[in-house]
């Protein structure tokens, strides 16, 4: 009976509140909330505001990302590996007694002064770069100072090792890694990464990663984005010494995907050695059984002749897939007289239409077609604020999920979170863009609820998605490698 009276009382009180709403619609909201609370019927429901574009986009990705029907079981990765010593670039250069002068790029670093100038040049642009340091003794002194510097951190480094580490996070995958692997690197590697005994060596190869924050200043230079400058005196990786070990390991390992990187490390070698080694790379790739796709991960380069040789000396036709960023894409086009090659550098965010034109040209000129015996059918392009996956129709499946997964991992890895933290990322991709500048491209308006945009051009399909950029990145090194690995993990190669 008491229960019935309580329910009736609540009903009458609710009716009374309804009458107040009806008769006094102008009554302030605070007064109504106070009245509601005083009736002890619980707090008034707080209206839920609209979700942020970042929250909508992250939720849409999660709904889109699905496993491929046929998944990789065994992945072989080679051939560059090292220990990354990560440190504040400005603090290290100050500790070395250097002061900020004028920024200037150097294709090869010969001195501390060259290092200071090149670091400032790229810091001022907020762009990533990698250079070879020619003087062994000077590099050793700098590396020792960096390694012992307070706050210096040691990580797995080298594109192949970083890609292998990312794949190894999937425990149902078996991962083979070949490269010059010393004791420190071996200690840092995931237990799921198998290293052939022939890859082990007594000393590690060290790469110095000079990081800077967005807005960080040194002298007259201010970084527009957080990024890093990488340099090394790396002879094992530079000569691709582990290439033969890598190829000889494949027969026993029996991979269903091969990932190759490290060609950029040859920039410190003579032209004769570069030419000889590239031919050996092509021969090695040709020995991999038909039906096993090979992905080539490119990295920062300055030698146009080397890049042109990679494009033209049968390396591109021998691989099925490419991974590269905006600097490598434009440099590739400049080296091989491709579209928009008169552009000296990107002005801010790379134009989507221009990027699309260059990707189209690579696949049309060097990819598979009825008239060309090439294996190249896929390119995964990544820049800070968006990614594009371009594929020749009929050869790859699940690319919508693959491009979304690659973009998602960019946000989680940079912020060092398991999932996207929408409070720590921002949507910076262009809200509108044209898909081509060389023909009448479509006009696209970005919709966070449908974050993957697809368009087609003469038998080539493009998948575009924005990136949720980490506002306060914990670590920028290896993002491109993680992006490419994640995109490959979700990709499915269709059998010929």
From Swiss-Prot:
How does this protein's activity depend on the pH of its environment? Optimum pH is 5.75-6.5 and 8.75-9.0.
Its family?
A: Belongs to the ADP-dependent glucokinase family.
Q: Where is the signal peptide?
A: 1-22
Q: What does this protein do?
A: Catalyzes the phosphorylation of D-glucose to D-glucose 6-phosphate using ADP as the phosphate donor. GDP and CDP can replace ADP, but with reduced efficiency.
Which pathway, per its entry?
Carbohydrate degradation; glycolysis
Q: Which reaction does it catalyse?
A: D-glucose + ADP = D-glucose 6-phosphate + AMP + H(+)
EC id: 2.7.1.147
Q: Boundaries of each ADPK domain copy?
A: 52-496
Report the active site residues: 481 (proton acceptor)
Name where it mostly resides.
secreted
Query: What keywords appear on the UniProt entry?
Result: Glycolysis, Kinase, Magnesium, Metal-binding, Secreted, Signal, Transferase
Q: Quaternary structure per UniProt?
A: Monomer.
Cofactor(s) listed: Mg(2+)
Q: Which organism is it from?
A: Mus musculus
Protein name (record)? ADP-dependent glucokinase
Top-rank taxon, per record = Eukaryota
Please list the GO biological process terms of this entry.
glucose metabolic process; glycolytic process
Instruction: Report the co-factor binding details.
Output: Binds 1 Mg(2+) ion per subunit.
